Each structure stands twice: as C-alpha cells, then as structure tokens.
Amino acid sequence: MGSPFAKKEDRPDINDEQKGMKKKVAIQGIAGSYHDVAAQRYFEGEAVEPVPCDTFREVIEHVSAGTVGMMAIENTIAGSLLQNHELIREGNCRIVGEYKLRIMHSFAALPGTRAEDITEVNSHPIALMQCRDFLDTLPGAKLVECDDTAGSARWVAEKQMHGHGVICARRAAEMYGLEVLAEGVETNKRNYTRFLVIARPDLAEHMQQEAVRNKASLVFALPHTSGSLSKVLTILSFYDMNLSKIQSLPIIGREWEYMFYVNLTFEDYTRYRQALEAIIPLTNDLKTLGEYEQGKQSI
C-alpha cells in the first residue's frame, strides 16, 4: 500500500532542485526556529528556503509531495519524540542524513527593553523548562507557553509587545528585529537535539548516489516467543553492528505487541547487509527507514 500522505499528480519533478532555485526544506515551526537552524547548518553552502509547517504530520505531507524535510527525533534532555518515529514509517519516508544541534537559547525582547522591565516571558514549553534557572532570576515575570520559539519572537516583534521577553534561537531574535538581552540561558549546556533529514524514496535514492553510509535506522516487530529480541541483538553483535539506540512503541490495536526502532552504526557496509539478511527470518515487518552518514555534532 502506498503512502497515505501524497497524490502522485502533486509530486514535483525530481530535478526541480537543480534549476537554480533555493532548496526548500519542510520544517515544523517558522523561519528562525531550531528546525530552521538545523536545516541551514546541514545544508551549509546552499540557499535554503524553509517551508513552515504547523505540525510534524504536515512536514510528512510535504515530504511525500517531494520536498525535503527536517524533523527532530530526540533531545538529550527531553528524550525521544515518539510520534515522529511512527510518522516517518507510516509516511514511507527515507532518512538521508542527520544533524545534532546544540540548543543554545537566547533571551530577547524589543530593542531598548531592560530585563527588569519584563513582566511576561513567551516560548515553547520545553524551552521554558530548559531555561528554568535563568527564569527564576525574573521572579516578577509570568511564563506563557506558545507553540513555537520563533513564533513567539515574531509575535512580540510584530505586535510590539513591550514588557514581553522570549526564549528563542539567536537567529530568530535577529530575524525579527529583537534585542538579545542574554545568551546561553539554558540550564544544561549539554543540550542537543538530533534532527533527521527525510525525503521521498525516489528522491532519497537520487540524493544518496555517492553518499557515505555508516549508519542505519530499522524498524521491525518480533514474534511472541521467548528470547526473540535477544536473538536479534546477538546476531547484530556477531556482525559487529553497534546498537546506538533502541526504542519500542506499542502497535495500536494489538495489545502488548511492539514495534522496535533501532539505530545501528558500522564500519563495513557489506557486514551490515549480511546482518540485515540474517535477522530477516527472526523479525516481522522489517523495514529499513534509512542508510546514511552518521551526523556531525555542533559545538
């Protein structure tokens, strides 16, 4: 069964990106968001035009129609975005790359605003949570949750909200004309988000013709037999696969059954393919979500 997200007639030509246009990248949020920052870093040297989306499902819809997507998959503090694993699988998307972005939050407001003038701070709830120690130094400020860090910055700027501060990326503050009052206000300085670059299968093949492949993302179910997961892991170990992540999600409508999302890193692609063949008889619904180069981590 094909992807439920796209109609064939809506799909652009595979060579559209080669005609001198900006590279369009679908992101959750707007320009200046951390998804936008990750896209700009990953495609450094290319002209990137973010395609704003309200939801991650909307990102998948754009990817199914032929646009490259950038999607957060896990954060070192907040953990995994579980629904995004399922969206990638259900949308029949392919992972073609990843980028690990250090999340450095800035505190910004309208130009000329002083920190003591702030009566309300607006941002995404996770950003507010990650800056709690800094926000405690503003005891008179009310914290108000919003859908997007960059959206908060744009709203304060466009509505000229005096007395409002925002937690956002420096890129968002500069883009919308706010003044950065403090930088690096996150409590934990080892705050990273891993973003996946995703594409429609035919575009993924085109993008990866000469790509280095030393990481793979797989998903599979297992039979209800004793030691079924242990057997799979033993085989992966035998073929020198490094299991960098394993995540289980319940299968809706099938009580106590799970899909396992696995990330593997490896040095020998041939050994990886042999490992994949070896676990096929032990798994159900095995699917490769992507084979790609292990991502760099920003400083």
PLM-predicted stretches and their roles:
Residues 1-299:
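Domain-level signature for soluble enzymes in the chorismate/prephenate branch of the shikimate pathway
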